[in-house]
């Protein structure tokens, strides 16, 4: 399936333009630091742009009960995705799309702010924590890896975290459908 790239964005955003819009869906989160049981959650993600060379990003999650109804808010994160200009003088890879370097800045209401770096290659984005800053009252989050991808027109993502003394391990994943 071809990526739905848009041309009404700055050139540096075109490789990420398939993310633009509102996505909704559900996923599962679980980590030893949060107890043994997995929690189903609903999620809304919005990627936007205002004509400058970055994407705005907001994600909101809610716990879901067995019937799929929302029960309580879980998390909100907001930030900016900053693709770096591609050096078109460098030869393109023999296979696959040219990688786009990314810087992602995220803030959480729990007192955590992080900078992630990584690459986008066509419909796949891989990010890793570069810097994590926490307030004195924030939980002990020290690192994270994120993977985003488009599969069958849906946005899938997975998050691994190092949290409260536990090494990096799977924390959450979801499948989201574009709604606008």
UniProtKB/Swiss-Prot annotation:
The protein's name: Ferric nitrobindin-like protein
A Pfam cross-reference name: THAP4_heme-bd
Placement of sequence motif GXWXGXG: 21-27
PANTHER family per record: PEROXYNITRITE ISOMERASE THAP4, THAP4 PROTEIN
Organism superkingdom: Bacteria
SUPFAM superfamilies assigned: Lipocalins
Family per similarity comment: Belongs to the nitrobindin family.
Gene3D superfamilies linked: 2.40.128.20
């Amino acid at each position: 399936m071809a990526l739905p790239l848009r041309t009404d964005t700055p050139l540096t955003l075109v490789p990420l333009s398939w993310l633009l819009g509102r996505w909704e869906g559900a996923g599962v989160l679980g980590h030893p630091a949060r107890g043994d049981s997995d929690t189903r959650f609903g999620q809304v993600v919005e990627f936007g742009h205002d004509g400058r060379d970055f994407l705005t990003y907001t994600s909101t999650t809610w716990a879901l009960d067995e019937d799929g109804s929302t029960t309580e808010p879980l998390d909100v994160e907001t930030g900016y995705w900053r693709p770096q200009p591609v050096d078109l003088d460098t030869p393109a890879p023999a296979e696959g799309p040219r990688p786009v370097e990314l810087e992602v800045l995220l803030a959480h209401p729990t007192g955590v702010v992080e900078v992630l770096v990584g690459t986008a290659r066509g419909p796949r984005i891989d990010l890793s924590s570069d810097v994590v800053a926490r307030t004195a009252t924030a939980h002990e989050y020290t690192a994270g890896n994120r993977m985003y991808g488009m599969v069958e027109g849906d946005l899938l993502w997975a998050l691994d975290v190092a949290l409260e003394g536990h090494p990096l391990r799977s924390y959450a994943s979801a499948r989201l459908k574009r709604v606008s």
